[in-house]
Amino acid sequence: MAGPWIITLLCGLLGATLVQANVYPPAVLNLGPEVIQKHLTQALKDHDATAILQELPLLRAMQDKSGSIPILDSFVHTVLRYIIWMKVTSANILQLDVQPSTYDQELVVRIPLDMVAGLNTPLIKTIVEFQMSTEVQALIRVERSKSGPAHLNLSDCSSNESTLRLSLLHKLSFVVNSLAKNVMNLLVPALPQIVKNHLCPVIQQAFDDMYEDFLRLTTAPIALSPGALEFGLLSPAIQDSNILLNLKAKLLDSQARVTNWFNNSATSLMETTPDRAPFSLTVRQDLVNAIVTTLVPKEELVILLRFVIPDVARQLQMDIKEINAEAANKLGPTQMLKIFTHSTPHIVLNEGSARAAQSVVLEVFPTNTDVRPFFSLGIEASYEAQFFTEDNRLMLNFNNVSIERIKLMISDIKLFDPEVLKDTLTKILEYTLLPNENGKLRTGVPMSMSKALGYEKAMWSVSKGALKLTPASS
């Protein structure tokens, strides 16, 4: 638990950026329309949606549509007498469009279709071809259930006559053109229904698979050293044209035992408003700190100062000589320091920058055989914290030590103002504690989410109360 000194320091670091705090989940995966379009398009390809379009039963659809109207049925049979076969010869799904709905928690997905149909008639030796363009529209909604958690669902899939365009690709004889025109007139009321009946179930399956893929890549365990980090779905949401997956998290030790839960929304300074990035993963500050605590646990360092940093050892001896010359003369070749990390580094995330605060206890021993120190100091220090990406890993590095407060806890040489040691202590922490902690952070945190979403490079940025992962600009 952080002591009163570190709380004071953290309050100071937070004070400069204090804004009205809101309630946010531990993490948020924000998927923009570009990602939704790309992955739904791929899911439609995986389900052979274009092959489904090429199998549309055009002739039967015209017959079924006219069957209930005797006069129209007679006309259809007259037209069909001149058709040997008729089918969709090519089909393409054009670029999907994802837009916000006029209703809350709802997206509109428009799927434009471009098809060419051909018919064979004894009236001419060549195939009569005409182009059919239409659009399928569906809604993505957040569905809430009394018996289970909320989930995303695709519904109201349909195709409307108003989006249908048919045109003859090649003008032929008057008789053939008239036949083709009659066929197209019959297709206008029939085509939207067969597209709905045959393609909409495929779109539903493709959406369900896409949603499962999003959940799978989000909840895949992330290896830490030691242990692991796992995300889980709290709830989905829709904001503007974006899908938001509000995430819970848990940290596990090397034995896969849960050491920390983050399964509730909490007051935070973080901002999660969708931006123009194709996607973003926003991680709340307290979860960032829990990850850092896992990577950099509390520990004790023992340092033979003259062997490790002799220049600093001489400087410390000179400082002690100013306090007590007799004590300084007792410092031997095995002069020893012990550093106890009273707290793990606590990260404070501000807009565009981050700092870490940490409390340590430092003890100075004249030799490595002494059991009682010359003196013990409580030190409150802060560092610059730099987050960056390296090979799809979240990396963190500390540098530029700043000592905020020093307290003399025990002294066997005499009472003195510990501020006289500030420069030397800063160098000691710079040369010993920081390299040790940076070494533990060197493995980083693997984050393959960006690559799984189709972006080779990503970058981490710091905002108020949160870390954010977004694709790197090309």
Swiss-Prot record:
<dbReference type="GO" id="GO:0008289">
    <property type="term" value="F:lipid binding"/>
</dbReference>
<feature type="glycosylation site" description="N-linked (GlcNAc...) asparagine">
    <location>
        <position position="153"/>
    </location>
</feature>
<dbReference type="GO" id="GO:0005615">
    <property type="term" value="C:extracellular space"/>
</dbReference>
<dbReference type="Pfam" id="PF01273">
    <property type="entry name" value="LBP_BPI_CETP"/>
</dbReference>
<keyword id="KW-0399">Innate immunity</keyword>
<dbReference type="InterPro" id="IPR017943">
    <property type="entry name" value="Bactericidal_perm-incr_a/b_dom"/>
</dbReference>
<feature type="glycosylation site" description="N-linked (GlcNAc...) asparagine">
    <location>
        <position position="160"/>
    </location>
</feature>
<keyword id="KW-0391">Immunity</keyword>
<dbReference type="GO" id="GO:0002227">
    <property type="term" value="P:innate immune response in mucosa"/>
</dbReference>
<dbReference type="InterPro" id="IPR017942">
    <property type="entry name" value="Lipid-bd_serum_glycop_N"/>
</dbReference>
<feature type="glycosylation site" description="N-linked (GlcNAc...) asparagine">
    <location>
        <position position="263"/>
    </location>
</feature>
<keyword id="KW-1015">Disulfide bond</keyword>
<dbReference type="InterPro" id="IPR021193">
    <property type="entry name" value="Bpifb1"/>
</dbReference>
<comment type="similarity">
    <text>Belongs to the BPI/LBP/Plunc superfamily. Plunc family.</text>
</comment>
<dbReference type="GO" id="GO:0034144">
    <property type="term" value="P:negative regulation of toll-like receptor 4 signaling pathway"/>
</dbReference>
<keyword id="KW-0964">Secreted</keyword>
<protein>
    <recommendedName>
        <fullName>BPI fold-containing family B member 1</fullName>
    </recommendedName>
</protein>
<feature type="signal peptide">
    <location>
        <begin position="1"/>
        <end position="21"/>
    </location>
</feature>
<feature type="glycosylation site" description="N-linked (GlcNAc...) asparagine">
    <location>
        <position position="400"/>
    </location>
</feature>
<comment type="function">
    <text>May play a role in innate immunity in mouth, nose and lungs. Binds bacterial lipopolysaccharide (LPS) and modulates the cellular responses to LPS. May be involved in formation of the left-right axis in the node of the developing embryo.</text>
</comment>
<keyword id="KW-0325">Glycoprotein</keyword>
<dbReference type="InterPro" id="IPR001124">
    <property type="entry name" value="Lipid-bd_serum_glycop_C"/>
</dbReference>
<dbReference type="Pfam" id="PF02886">
    <property type="entry name" value="LBP_BPI_CETP_C"/>
</dbReference>
<keyword id="KW-0732">Signal</keyword>
<feature type="disulfide bond">
    <location>
        <begin position="157"/>
        <end position="200"/>
    </location>
</feature>
